[in-house]
């Protein structure tokens, strides 16, 4: 593997910021050295949300958003370099996931689209950039997601302990790590996505800090049962999903015809949906000794409490307790995937995505030679 300093850039479905992380990576270790979260301007955030929820968009608007996101990602990297007093020459490459605006891995013409022009990232930072990680897996019949389980396996596999790494971002996904067995992983369903969208609509807050609003409400069993009957939860793996499926339009369909309820009760019920849909999948794959949680949902005390209650006998903790920052996990993963791409090594796991073979992921955007 090509060792060096790498920067990972991740803008996830939760849209809570652009996560940028600096790590020293070699064949055996991934050592995080610095991190930074760059704000996403509100107009860009709203444009992304509109596209993800199927609003009509012109090619001009899509192209301009692609450019603006590329510039934004470059600004995030340059800010991290300034904070760490490093130069572009000190960095081997950037692994830039991009912003998913559509993910449709099934049907006659499976597709996934991450925007944020990597040409701009490379040009503005002066650093070789690796991006467009998902579509090669799709080309081999895979879901294109999740890709992070290969990183979980490299970093958090235990010699004897059966573990599940659970990432709760906008969407929740799990990685089953069993010594001596192939990795399994998939998207379980909504993580923070519906929670954030609902509190933004009713309270104009980007997220429910410490789950205070949800804890002021009561779970509505009728709504919960209706949501849990959604066909996605019964699908067999490999499977993946996103904001184009689980969004406020989906929630409004679930609420249709039910007696009126307080918005905080809906919020409480959405927390229970996230916790129950995760817990059911944890049990479906045979459980584990330790559930390691990362992503923004790891900071939601109500989700963590409910997971512990729904999974008795399983130790529920965070990846931070294993020395890996839960907030930076995905950005770290794409820094690591960039190192594998530059080394000509595969980055996907067919046992997770359903692809017909392992493959090198992504496209490389080199900088001009001096």
From Swiss-Prot:
Its EC number is 2.7.1.170. GO terms for molecular function: ATP binding; kinase activity; phosphotransferase activity, alcohol group as acceptor. Keywords: ATP-binding, Carbohydrate metabolism, Kinase, Nucleotide-binding, Transferase. Pfam families: AnmK. SUPFAM superfamilies: Actin-like ATPase domain. It catalyses: 1,6-anhydro-N-acetyl-beta-muramate + ATP + H2O = N-acetyl-D-muramate 6-phosphate + ADP + H(+). ATP binds at residues 12-19. Pathway: Amino-sugar metabolism; 1,6-anhydro-N-acetylmuramate degradation; Cell wall biogenesis; peptidoglycan recycling. InterPro entries: Anhydro_N_Ac-Mur_kinase, ATPase_NBD. It is an enzyme of class 2 (transferase). GO terms for biological process: 1,6-anhydro-N-acetyl-beta-muramic acid catabolic process; amino sugar metabolic process; peptidoglycan turnover. HAMAP family: AnhMurNAc_kinase. Catalyzes the specific phosphorylation of 1,6-anhydro-N-acetylmuramic acid (anhMurNAc) with the simultaneous cleavage of the 1,6-anhydro ring, generating MurNAc-6-P. Is required for the utilization of anhMurNAc either imported from the medium or derived from its own cell wall murein, and thus plays a role in cell wall recycling. Belongs to the anhydro-N-acetylmuramic acid kinase family. This is Anhydro-N-acetylmuramic acid kinase. It comes from Pectobacterium carotovorum subsp. carotovorum (strain PC1). The lineage of its organism: Bacteria, Pseudomonadati, Pseudomonadota, Gammaproteobacteria, Enterobacterales.
């Amino acid at each position: 593997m090509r060792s060096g300093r790498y920067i990972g850039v991740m803008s996830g479905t939760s849209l809570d910021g652009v996560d940028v992380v600096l790590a020293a990576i070699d064949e055996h270790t991934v050592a995080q050295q610095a991190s930074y979260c760059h704000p996403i301007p509100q107009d860009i955030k709203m444009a992304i949300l509109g596209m993800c929820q199927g609003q009509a968009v012109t090619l001009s608007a899509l192209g301009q958003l692609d450019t603006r996101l590329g510039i934004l990602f470059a600004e995030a990297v340059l800010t991290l370099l300034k904070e760490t007093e490093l130069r572009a020459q000190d960095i081997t490459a950037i692994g830039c996931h991009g912003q998913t605006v559509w993910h449709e891995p099934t049907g006659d013409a499976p597709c996934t689209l991450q925007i944020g022009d990597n040409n701009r990232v490379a040009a503005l930072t002066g650093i070789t950039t690796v991006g467009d990680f998902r579509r090669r897996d799709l080309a081999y019949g895979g879901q294109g997601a999740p890709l992070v389980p290969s990183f979980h396996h490299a970093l958090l596999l235990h010699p004897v302990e059966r573990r599940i790494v659970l990432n709760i971002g906008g969407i929740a996904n799990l990685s089953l790590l069993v010594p001596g067995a192939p990795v399994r992983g998939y998207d379980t369903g909504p993580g923070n996505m519906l929670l954030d969208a609902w509190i933004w609509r009713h309270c104009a807050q980007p997220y429910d800090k410490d789950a205070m609003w949800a804890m002021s409400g009561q779970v509505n069993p009728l709504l919960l049962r209706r949501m849990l009957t959604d066909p996605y939860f019964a699908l067999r793996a490999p499977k993946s999903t996103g904001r184009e499926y689980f969004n406020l339009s989906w929630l409004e369909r679930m609420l249709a015809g039910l007696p009126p309820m307080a918005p905080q009760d809906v919020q409480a019920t959405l927390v229970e949906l996230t916790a129950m849909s995760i817990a059911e999948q944890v049990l479906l794959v045979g459980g584990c000794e330790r559930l390691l949680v990362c992503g923004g949902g790891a900071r939601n005390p109500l989700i963590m409490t409910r997971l512990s209650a729904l999974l008795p006998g399983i130790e529920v903790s965070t990846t931070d307790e294993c020395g890996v920052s839960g907030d930076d996990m995905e950005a770290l993963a794409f820094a690591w995937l960039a190192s594998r791409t530059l080394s000509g090594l595969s980055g996907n796991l067919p046992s997770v995505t359903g692809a017909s073979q392992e493959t090198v992921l992504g496209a490389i955007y080199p900088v001009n030679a001096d």
